[in-house]
């Protein structure tokens, strides 16, 4: 960052989550990420700097090692002129969603993270004058718990995402249950992956967004019908996938465009050869537990037809989905097995609070921290060291379960044969693409009790709902058989 030349008019609002806000530069492929805090919570500049530096270090020393340097962009901490930050804050305020304005942008420290703009291709520093499409997917957890510590039988049959959908709809978070099941996407089977991606497109919730030239064109819009959304989306995408033919508008055109998009995303997700160290986890973390979620609509529809769900074809080991799944599976014990170990660490810290720094709970996230994560033993020797390792592995696994994958696509130019970037074909065109991961902040140690309570809540609600539905079905069948009258006619 060239501090003396910062102009707030060159930056625009890009988006925000619960803990940070992002602005993007108009010409350069960079974004600034600022922390957000409730109005009454004051942090010193040093604390904010350390918080941001920890995020950078964790990305650089841990997630880059697991996922590969081509996928992980950890950025750097920068110090900005306070006047620039204040003016920027005023400029973007009107663009912020009302639901996010309960927290304020940090305008006092001057610190932010500078990162590449992942809605652009990750090969050029400046925005190219060609159209760019970016699909952001939050794939969620791709396996069913295999730990013997799991006490709820349902957790061995139905994935966390599918169970959580029922609770989210009941509490009004979403209007309807999504047909998406992460196990279908992570299966490596193209038929199941296509179904998963179409389901995400039908009910995006906050798990799918599409950007065109850096601008959000498709995401969670509760008030609008999926049909209207799809036709509008197809209008945006048609020039990418059918650049020169006169494909008419209407349902046929919409279906053709969506099909092309789904096929291209699938090919990109199955591609890749970036070297990460996640392979070091695979001997202990092979595919365990069921490979199919009983609640997946894809699996249910096949069962109704008397067919078996296609097994996972297996993800290529170089692809990002495979590596992400490996890191997710560092959750070796499930939250049920992990929570007693968290309590062991807590008791130790109550007795020796000064040890918190030595245990690296709040960092530093360095090579030593990373090396301890590679211990995949599940034999509890009763020590604090064992408990701490499992707690840290769980935090890293939860981070991988909540990360987002960014796929940037740009139509290849006629003279692009010398281009060094990877290319994916569609029916009528070819795309240069890049794949990146974001949302890689380490999950807080303090959130573990909340995760334990939430897990129980999700499973109990799902079990109750499913039991009620099953009882209703059985009751209807019994009633039908009761009401049935056999009439014999003389012949």
Swiss-Prot record:
GO terms for biological process: inositol phosphate biosynthetic process; inositol phosphate metabolic process; positive regulation of transcription of nucleolar large rRNA by RNA polymerase I. One of its GO terms (cellular component) is nucleolus. Its EC number is 2.7.1.158. It catalyses: 1D-myo-inositol 1,3,4,5,6-pentakisphosphate + ATP = 1D-myo-inositol hexakisphosphate + ADP + H(+). One of its GO terms (molecular function) is molecular adaptor activity. Keywords: ATP-binding, Cytoplasm, Kinase, Nucleotide-binding, Nucleus, Phosphoprotein, Transferase. It is found in: Cytoplasm; Nucleus. A motif (EXKPK motif) lies at residues 136-140. The modification Phosphoserine is found at residue 282. Phosphorylates Ins(1,3,4,5,6)P5 at position 2 to form Ins(1,2,3,4,5,6)P6 (InsP6 or phytate). InsP6 is involved in many processes such as mRNA export, non-homologous end-joining, endocytosis, ion channel regulation. It also protects cells from TNF-alpha-induced apoptosis. The EXKPK motif is conserved in inositol-pentakisphosphate 2-kinases of both family 1 and 2. This is Inositol-pentakisphosphate 2-kinase. It comes from Homo sapiens (Human).
